[in-house]
Amino acid sequence: MKTLKTILTLFTISIFAVSCSSDDDNKPEPIKYNEENPLDAYMAGSGFSQKAVDVKNSGIYEYGFSFKPTVTGKINALIVKIPDVNSTLRITLWDAATKTVIKSEVVNVATANVTVEKAITPIALTKDKEYFFTVNSDDWINRTKTDGSAATYPIVAGNITITGYAYISSTAAETIFPTNARNTYYAGDMTFKFQQTE
């Protein structure tokens, strides 16, 4: 009888030990958010999805859009589509407040009018901080509304709020912050994959 009592006691202790250790194993896994590409929502919200004209070899410009993430996150990839071949297309992310370059990447556009995606080392973005995303090129897709009217900024595109569009005349070697704001067109196409991290 004493042996049976000892066995039951050991059995009870082992059940408690297993149940306590399994509590530690049930920690929730961190949430993994889906990647977002803000371009389609930007084009729809601005109306610039209505008309597109290819522009080739039309002088070199640094052009793009400013934006603020509404959540903390990161850029995981760059996406571009232009109407000409360019093996050294430079895409740049700027700090909009200081007008300084955060990161530049070169993308090889081997075929005209084909979307190219380049995975990059993730670039962390701070919630509500304004950034500028530009490309340096003499080719672009000029997107407008059919009636030529202006878009109203800001434009919400998921967790990214587009705050404006601008350009500046440049050279292939220069990286110059765009200061000529426009709201009647968008030259592109360039965008990124954004992923919320918290």
PLM regions and their residue ranges:
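Bacterial N-terminal signal peptides that target proteins for export
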Residues: M1-L8
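Sparse, context-dependent recognition of short Cys/His-centered cofactor- or disulfide-binding micro-motifs
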Residues: K5, Q50-D54, S58-Y63, K103-A110, ...
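Short, linear, compositionally biased motifs with a strong N-terminal bias
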Residues: L10-I13
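C-terminal motif of bacterial Sec signal peptides marking the signal peptidase cleavage site
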Residues: F16-S19
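Beta-sheet-rich sandwich/jelly-roll-like modules and their strand-loop junctions
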Residues: S21-L93, W140-E198
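Aromatic- and Gly/Pro-enriched, solvent-exposed loop/edge beta-strand patches characteristic
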Residues: S87-I162
